[in-house]
Amino acid sequence: FASLLRRPGIQLSGDITPSYSALSVGTLKDIKANFEQRQIGLRPVFLMRDPIERIISSQRMRLRKQNQLNQEVEVEALRQLSVERPESVTLRSDYAHTLIALNQVFDPSECFIDLYERLFSPTSWQRLCDVLNVPYEEPDWEQQVNVSRTDTSIPNEVLAALGTWQAPTLTAVRQSMGHLDLAELWPLAHRWCKDLS
C-alpha cells in the first residue's frame, strides 16, 4: 500500500472495505503510527447503514453474484442468517465496537462518522470534504451505484429475528448519535430492533 502512495502526483488515496470496521484499537493505533511515520494524513470515514437493511442488501448482492437471486431463495437465506448469526456478519454490524475503537485512537476532527442514509445531502457531503480537506464538488446526486432494490416481501418473523440480532447495534448508535432521528433514517431497525438502552 505504501508503494502506491509514493507514485508521483498522488495527493489523495482511499481504501474501503466493510472488514475495516472490525479492526482492534491496537491495529488502528499501528495503522495510524505507520501513516504518521510516513507523514501521511489519515482520515477514517465510517458510514453506518440501517443494520437490517445492510444485512438484506449484502445477502441480496451475494445471491446475485451466485446467480441465485429470487424471492424464495432470498427469504430462506435471510431466515437462515438470522438463526446462524455468522460471526463475519456480526462483526461488520458491530457499530459499537467501531465507534469505541475510532474514539480511542483518533481525534473526532480526524474522522467522518455518519449514517449512510445521510451521506447523499449537501450538508453531509460538505462535512466529508471538510474532514478530508478537499474542495467541495457537487456530485451527481441522481447517479446510483450498486442499487439492490427488490420487491421481495420479507416475512415479519424474519425481520423480527434480524431485529433481535441487530438490537445492540441500534442501541449503540442511539447512545452515540442520539441527536439523529433514527425512526426516520433507519425505519427497519427502528421497527424491528428492541431498544436495549
Protein language model features and the residues they cover:
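The conserved 3'-phosphoadenosine-5'-phosphosulfate
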Residues: R49, T90, I100-S197
